[in-house]
Amino acid sequence: FYKMPRDCFTVGEGIDGLLGNLVRLFIEPGDTVVSSLGAYPTFKYHVDGFGGNISLVPYNNNYEDLDALLSATKKSKAKILYLSNPDNPMGTFHSKERIQDFIDNIPDKTILCLDEAYSDFVDVNELAPIDIERENVIRFRTFSKAYGLAGLRIGYGIGNKKLVEAFNKVRNHFGVNRLGQIAARVALEDQKYLQVVLKKVDKSKKDIAAIFKKFGFTSLASRTNFVPINSGGDGNFAAKLMTGLIQEKIFVRMPSVSPLNSFIRIT
């Protein structure tokens, strides 16, 4: 599918499992990692569990702040730098040129963990090319989002052979079940259906944004499968809005920290 050597791939129990393996490989008590304040929390759970210190950089206008992340990484000599693109939880997206420049400026001794769980919702030509010669970048992708196989827990990492081989030292060798493997293979072979799903998701996002617009709410241009809606208030107001929607059987989430928590998310 990617036309890359098999030994440049590692498979795990979703990206969550792979994040755990990455931290287990490289983080010892007292080591520093860098992420964004309000970013996907599971990475922080793993870092805390292995005794690492996590430096959290605030978002800049609903985007992860690439310049500030680089600065924090260099200043702290971080072992791992975590970035999601498209972003979770805000759905924003950095261009391939911006990401490539970001990658080119990562210190050699820092591992960049590029979480691309939502990359299937972006045209492949909009993504920075995968360079398997670069030894300090691992890109994580999943079958949980666009492919709809979240319950089967299939995630995978793409990177340099040497980096990928290291995962064999710590991974759960029986963690990926056979049913999940079969489903993932079949899903990859049915790209026509994936395109149908992507078109339906895009239409649904536009419909959801239009409904909220009628009531005076604005939304972000999301490059994921969810719509971030600006509540127009603070986190407490957004929480009340979320609770009301949940009571109407509309499943809604919201970011956990200010100022991101003025938004709610509808998938």
What function would you assign to each model-found segment?
Residues 6-30, 155:
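Conserved beta-loop-alpha segment that forms the PLP phosphate-binding cup at the N-terminus of a helix
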Residues 5-9, 29-32, 109, 116, ...:
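Short acidic capping loops at alpha-helix termini that bridge into adjacent secondary structure
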Residues 136-213, 217-220:
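PLP-dependent aminotransferase class I/II
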